[in-house]
């Protein structure tokens, strides 16, 4: 039987989540689900999670963004079947004003997100940039470190 791993402390889950900077955002519209690979910036000090969406007319993201009351953002690191970590943040997305982006949100995003240069490079004239904060209601994590368990860098910091 496969090992489903062990739950990790809230502090470890938060540190792992902050270290990743990318994951899959799950949105829903009635019974239709939509997963979006996305970069995010999470600030450990403030607990703020910022995302930048690059939308175009052919994208379904806007429809799902508007319809989703609750979303999940999943990030993970997989080394082998018995060596992995994951974290799931659940909450709601709040659209950010241009003032919020200029004053603090862009700094969080560009300091902590992974692969942000891709989003900036692919910006075209027919795209629209929207910024959101994921207001996290719960953040949980699991890990499996194999048979030869050693402390993770997140445990060592505790």
Regions found by a protein language model. Give the residues of each.
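Amphipathic alpha-helical interface surfaces
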Residues: 13, 58-61, 101-106
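Non-catalytic surface loops within mature trypsin-like serine protease
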Residues: 44, 57, 77, 95-97, ...
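Helix-adjacent hinge/juxtasegments
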Residues: 53, 57-87
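A generic structural signal for nonpolar/aromatic side chains embedded in well-ordered alpha-helices
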Residues: 17, 64-65, 108-109
């Amino acid at each position: 039987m496969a090992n489903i791993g062990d739950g990790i402390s809230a502090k470890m889950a938060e540190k792992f989540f902050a270290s990743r900077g990318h994951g899959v955002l799950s949105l829903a519209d009635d019974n239709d689900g939509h997963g979006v690979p996305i970069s995010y910036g999470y600030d450990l000090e403030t607990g703020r999670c910022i995302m930048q969406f690059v939308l175009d007319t052919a994208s379904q993201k806007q429809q799902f963004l508007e319809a989703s009351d609750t979303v999940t953002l999943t990030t993970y690191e997989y080394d082998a079947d018995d060596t992995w970590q994951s974290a799931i943040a659940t909450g709601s997305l709040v659209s950010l004003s241009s003032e919020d982006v200029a004053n603090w949100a862009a700094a969080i995003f560009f300091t902590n997100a992974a692969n942000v240069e891709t989003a900036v490079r692919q910006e075209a004239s027919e795209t629209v940039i929207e910024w959101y904060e994921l207001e996290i209601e719960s953040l949980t994590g699991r890990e499996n470190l194999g048979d030869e368990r050693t402390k993770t860098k997140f445990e060592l910091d505790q």
